[in-house]
Amino acid sequence: MKKITCGAKKKQPKIKTEMTGKGLTVHGGLLPVLNFMDKLYFFKAVETALHKQRGANAKYQFADAVQMIVIGVITGATAMTQVAAVWADDVLRRMAGYEKTPVDTSLGRIMKEASYRDVTAMEGLIHRFRTKVWKRAVRSGTYLKSAMSVMWLDVDSTVDGVFGKQEGAAKGYNPGKKGQESYHPLMGFVSETKEVLHSWFRTGSAYTSNGAVEFMKECLARIKKGVKVIVRADSGFFDGSLLDYLEATCSGYLIKVKLKNLNALLERQIWKAIDSKKLPGWEQAEFEYKCTTWSKSRKFIAVRQLIGIEQGLIELREYQSFCYVTTENLTPYAAHKKYGERATCETWIEECKTQMNAGHIRTSEFWANSALFQCAILAYNLLKWMALLTGGAVRQWEIKTMRLWLIRVAGKLTEGGRQLTLKLPRRFLHQEEWQLWERMSLTIF
């Protein structure tokens, strides 16, 4: 019998290892990130906004810790020890201009100096960076509806469970692990750019809509005058005081209804078929309704889908219903589809939590944890802004994809003629996207 050999696979060669390489890094893709942060005057902006000067003998300032944690989170760090491990990379330190970097305990000690004022300043920083990025995007020809006319703002909360005793953690709504202490952050996403407009780090006992009006006041203060904001949120934000505030500021809303008597209310409405051919079994209704605690009635829209018929003396039809309160001039079915786009908001929250590890790096103190949460939001937004300005396929990539194809690129730092050069592989996957990514990072704002 003739032996068939495969030409693709050859015998594995014997390879010895030597730990003698110099100037090597696995994070070559952080150079464009550092360049982008430099063009934003990131370090100076943090230093100026926080006005936080440590003692004269302190080697590292609060702004140093913020930058190191942001970079660490971008690489995928989920703990302070991992942030310190990332900065153990000699090449990264040289690229960022550091001779040495602090150990994890020193970073934690610096962050424990954070206060409510510092967290508020960090929230404001995100807004100032966004203003710069959006202006540059519009100048370069990117059409940003959110910067010019209408912004759909997706608001949601998320549960972040903790282990052990941590200040501010408390028992509250936690469907994943009932009874576990947690934090309950509140976040607002710009639907068009997928970035975080504003966020609060809250105790776990806070109800979903707790402080929603104050949160929206801070959100609207961060939006250009003349831009109409339409808030899209789940039933946790079905609150009369929030609707009153949004109407008073000429903002719109599309919010899922939460009522005890909702089914009975919907049964009393006049239902019309949407399209018997394209959408058989689907019906819609529109009506005015005033809740007990409201000062006035508002427009409700609803759709329902026939999911079963029970035959008997009386034919019983079973429906799956969806109901919303809104200010928008949309048909019930169009509003239902528009609300369905909000599902991506939950994806972004998950991306922010699991891929950017927002809320994962923690200390025992609440304001330190809140500042660390804002560092993760900064890291998330930085990559989203870089993707926005790079354009093309990169704009559609998730954080983990950017990290895999753009950040984790092997490199060797060499020096010659007083010039540092980062040498990358001659060929690697998504090389064209990486070159666009780097070119964008070198453009002055």
Language model features: what each stretch is:
Residues L50-N57, P332-Y339, Q355-A371, A387-E398, ...:
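Short, solvent-exposed helix-loop connector elements
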Residues K2-K16, G252-M356, G411, S441-F445:
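An anionic, glycine-rich sequence signature occurring as long contiguous blocks
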Residues G240-D244:
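Catalytic cores of alpha/beta
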Residues V73, W385-G411:
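Conserved nucleotidyltransferase catalytic core and NTase-mimicking acidic/glycine-rich helix/loop elements
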Residues M1-Y207, V213-K224, L246-T249, A393, ...:
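Dynamic "connector" segments at or just before major functional cores
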Residues V231-D239, L259-N261:
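Acidic, metal-coordinating catalytic cores used for nucleic-acid/nucleotide bond scission
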Residues F36, V83, V159, K277, ...:
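Short amphipathic alpha-helical "interface-anchor" segments enriched in bulky aromatics
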